[in-house]
Amino acid sequence: NDNTLSLHDALPIYLPAGAQWIDFWTGKSLKGGQTIQREVPIDIMPVYVRAGSILPWGPAAQYSTGKKWDNLTLRIYPGADAELTLYEDEFDNYNYEKGAYTTIAMKWNDKDRTLTINDRQGNYKGMLKNRKFNIIIVEPGKGCGDGDATTFDQSVSYRGKRVDLKL
């Protein structure tokens, strides 16, 4: 039995029931509760994101402190409501155990197509006080794959206070 993959094999992938699933690479939405055959090149891992997810996407970096996350993309996978708590700390010590970290709670209302970015909670030495969030609602051909997007549905300057966005 040869378990090696050829250059373009079709793999069986089970998508759990109770949700829509969005192909990370293409943005195509698929119904859960089924096994699909996904043809993939050898250098691509099939990844499916549950509809109703918010995925923060930072700059490519070799290590956690390599680049500031002052220009962060939020990929919204529509089809259901979503929540995300963005957690940040100093990256390189245990000060988070003493409360040195921040959280920013976010909520996506799929029906109203609104994103709420709540007040930042907490603080730590060297934290970003201001940043830009670039928001993309993922769809086929938009906000897909592991590259950096160049166009966004909306961008907002965030200064730690609640922002409500209609997308």
Language-model features and meaning:
Residues L15-L55:
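Conserved active-site neighborhood of enzyme catalytic/cofactor-binding cores
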Residues I44-D164:
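Accessory, solvent-exposed terminal regions and/or long lumenal/extracellular loops of proteins
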Residues A10-P16, K107:
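Long hydrophobic segments that form regular secondary structure
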Residues P12, I22, T114-T116:
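General beta-strand recognition
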Residues N1-D9:
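Single conserved hydrophobic/aromatic residue that forms the stacking wall/gate
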